[in-house]
Amino acid sequence: MIDSINQMTNDYYKSENLISTKEHFSTSGKYKLIVETYITKPGCWNYTKGIIHNIETGSVIQEIKRNYCVFHHSFFFKNNQEWLFCGKTYYSQCFINLETGEIFDNSTESKPDSFCWANVKSNPNGNIIIVEQCIWGGPYEIGFYDFTDPSIGWTELEFDNYQENYYLNIEWNYESKWLDNDTFEYIQKEDYSTKFQKFYDELTVEEELESSAIENDLVSRMYYRVVLKKIDNKMRFMVTESSPQHLIEIQNNNE
């Protein structure tokens, strides 16, 4: 299913293989990403190409060919300059400084068992990025990376005093934000029945049916909360906060 980057470049990116085009605009509105999708061959996934334009000048900043059917990308800011994250392969990363056109890519160093990145957000100054990532076929999780100097790469920041009961899961509903350049808050949220004063997973079948008949009975409520801080080049768990139901879950897991 996977071809080399060189073969991918030479074989598939032809006008007769183009099947769709979609536009995406940067946060500032100054840049436009056009994602083109190309059919490859029977039994294989499609490939994509991202073309990044400066809207004011009309110039093409970069063109990125990707060996996967989804062109994962994110716009973010670093030191007041706008950047684009994408990837030439599904297991590598490519960063483009949209102000200068400079590109940083690790596709030649990455391997198929590397993390696959789906989304990137930066801290306020852009020196730390949080990543929604997974090993191919595995569950998604949040990772943190040092993005101080992309010319020397981006090293993953390990967790300090990791708390397994406060897993940074993105498979369910969650909220996150940077409290400052080094401090990050994550809130795991779950549906909660206001009538029965229970989380949805605790409802009986009868209660589920009754709840579903009540308009807006289910609300999103905190299940647990975590605050992490970058200290000595690691992300340390500083605060953990649980709902009563989560405390019961922890107790049951420890028995």
Predicted regions and their residues:
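Short aromatic loop motif centered on NTY/YTY
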Residues: 117-119, 128-136, 143, 153-202
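Repeated scaffold domains used in trafficking and secretory/extracellular systems
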Residues: 15-25, 63-79, 111-122, 159-177
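Generic structural motif
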Residues: 7, 20-21, 31-40, 47-50, ...
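Surface-exposed loop/turn elements that mediate protein-protein interactions on large endomembrane-trafficking
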Residues: 2-16, 45-65, 89-112, 140-165, ...
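Hydrophobic beta-strand residues in large extracellular and virion-surface proteins
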Residues: 33, 50-53, 61-64, 75, ...
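Extracellular-facing segments of soluble proteins and assemblies that are Gly/Ser/Thr-biased and enriched
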Residues: 82-112, 116-134
